[in-house]
Design a protein with these regions (language model features):
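Accessory N-terminal region flanking or inserted into the helicase ATPase core
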Residues: 2-78, 87-92, 107, 117, ...
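Short, flexible loop segments at the rims of nucleotide/cofactor-binding pockets, characterized by
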Residues: 54-56, 81-83, 175-182
Length: 213
């Protein structure tokens, strides 16, 4: 439900904060006090429900992993798509660095591809870490996936990002093409074959589903 999504977002962004729900209320501009009270009660009831039945949700695995310090022994630690990690997931990374015995930690990511801030991604942590002089940065200067036309557009769009890590890389040696598709001209094509439409929230899925029906 939408309320459960708000609770999970609060735990992802503020894993240690006792006032995590008030914090997330301010961010989501949730001004309905009745809804706030309902969410707070839902959080309490859900925690008790899971505890009584020994049930777990996605965020609970991170909470227990950090609490129990149940890190496996590792020689090397690799973290991919790091720009999408939440504050809670960064805690997991930090705990692994401390408890796993890893000799080196390799973290891969691209702040320009950070598209999950709405789901709690802590891009500021990623940027701060990349700017830390104690860390060694190894830029990947050659893309083997992006053609020239897409590289040109992506570079132009990236310049509008207010806070980012400056970077330069070369596209693959192919002009390629870029297409801008609109839902309207796609309507006819939706009559045939299988289509997958991705939406950010269940509410949008519902609206799209009703429209297509």
């Amino acid at each position: 439900s939408e309320y459960q999504d708000i609770i999970n977002l609060a735990y992802a962004k503020y894993p240690d904060a006792e006032d995590r729900l008030p914090k997330i209320f301010r961010e989501t501009t949730l001004n309905n006090y009745g809804a706030r009270n309902m969410i707070e009660q839902m959080d309490l009831d859900l925690r008790k429900f899971k505890e009584d039945r020994d049930k777990y949700e996605y965020v609970d695995y991170f909470v227990n992993f950090i609490k129990n310090k149940s890190a496996p022994k590792l020689k090397y630690l690799f973290i991919d798509e790091a720009q999408d990690l939440s504050a809670q997931q960064w805690q997991v990374v930090n705990m692994l660095q401390q408890e796993s015995g890893a000799l080196e930690t390799w973290i891969a990511g691209d702040d320009d591809q950070a598209i999950f801030r709405w789901a709690g991604a802590d891009i500021e942590h990623f940027i701060t870490m990349a700017n830390d002089d104690n860390n060694t940065i190894k830029p990947l200067t050659q893309s083997y996936r992006i053609p020239i036309s897409v590289h040109t557009l992506a570079t132009k769009l990236a310049q509008s990002i207010s806070r980012r890590i400056p970077k330069e890389y070369k596209p693959r040696d192919e002009e390629g093409e870029r297409k801008v598709l609109n839902i309207r001209p796609l309507n006819k094509g939706l009559q045939e074959g299988d289509w997958l439409i991705l939406c950010r929230t269940h509410e949008i899925v519902k609206q799209v589903s009703e429209y297509l029906e």
